[in-house]
Amino acid sequence: MTMPYYASAEQIMRDRSELARKGIARGRSVVVLTFRDGVLFVAENPSTALHKVSELYDRLGFAAVGKYNEFENLRRAGIVHADMRGYSYDRRDVTGRSLANAYAQTLGTIFTEQPKPYEVEICVAEVGRVGSPKAPQLYRITYDGSIVDEQHFVVMGGTTEPIATAMRESYRADLDLEAAVGIAVNALRQGGAGEGEKRNVDVASLEVAVLDQSRPRRAFRRIAGTALEQLVPAEPAAASESAPEPKPDTETKPADTQD
């Protein structure tokens, strides 16, 4: 008689974590950061129809990486949750923390109870109302339901380590919009496959949006077209193109003298 297959709970959780992490790493990167006027979202996304960044509610934004169908289900569920809470109580009762907690519960339940975890990582961002001293909030929620209140910026998907390193080196709290877009795009260009290798990230492959704290009700707005082209820094010239060509040796040597 064959023995039944057995795997420890620890091994099952480890396998699920590995599956989710590999799925997330296959995606393109997203950078979310706070700047002087609110929160900026910059995502690598060549598609114009499928969005990785979107609005959740009046002062809330959403960014995600991983499997599109899975994080799209989460996005829509978050919108319904926010609408129901705002309708039942008050619009001010819909906060980033409440949405982040709801997402963490959902992802944690799926991770432990379903055969396959969601291969997603999401960020919920919130800005205060006009004139409020409340600082912007960033919440990172991972595939297993873990939730982290991040300071300053979040990097998700793809090769995150070189991008996060570039962000740590160049981030400042008082950035304006143009400077914030510049350091986010330059950080995404650091996510090459090899050490020191830079990737080509142009305007056509970017999805950019902001939560603008100065807007009176709905803070979310997208930036595209000419407005985005004016914000994105130009690609750095290759070293071979920028270096001056060596001049040919035109100096004449003195003629040999005979004794």
Curated annotation (Swiss-Prot):
Region spans: Disordered: 231-259
Regulation: The formation of the proteasomal ATPase ARC-20S proteasome complex, likely via the docking of the C-termini of ARC into the intersubunit pockets in the alpha-rings, may trigger opening of the gate for substrate entry. Interconversion between the open-gate and close-gate conformations leads to a dynamic regulation of the 20S proteasome proteolysis activity.
Stored Pfam families: Proteasome
Highest taxon in the source lineage: Bacteria
Recorded metabolic or biological pathway in which this protein acts: Protein degradation; proteasomal Pup-dependent pathway
Assigned keywords, A-Z: Cytoplasm, Proteasome
Reported function: Component of the proteasome core, a large protease complex with broad specificity involved in protein degradation. The R.erythropolis proteasomes are able to cleave oligopeptides after Tyr, Phe and Leu, very poorly after Arg but not after Glu. Thus, displays chymotrypsin-like activity, low trypsin-like activity but no caspase-like activity.
Family stated for the protein in its record: Belongs to the peptidase T1A family.
Record protein name field: Proteasome subunit alpha 1
Biological source species: Rhodococcus erythropolis
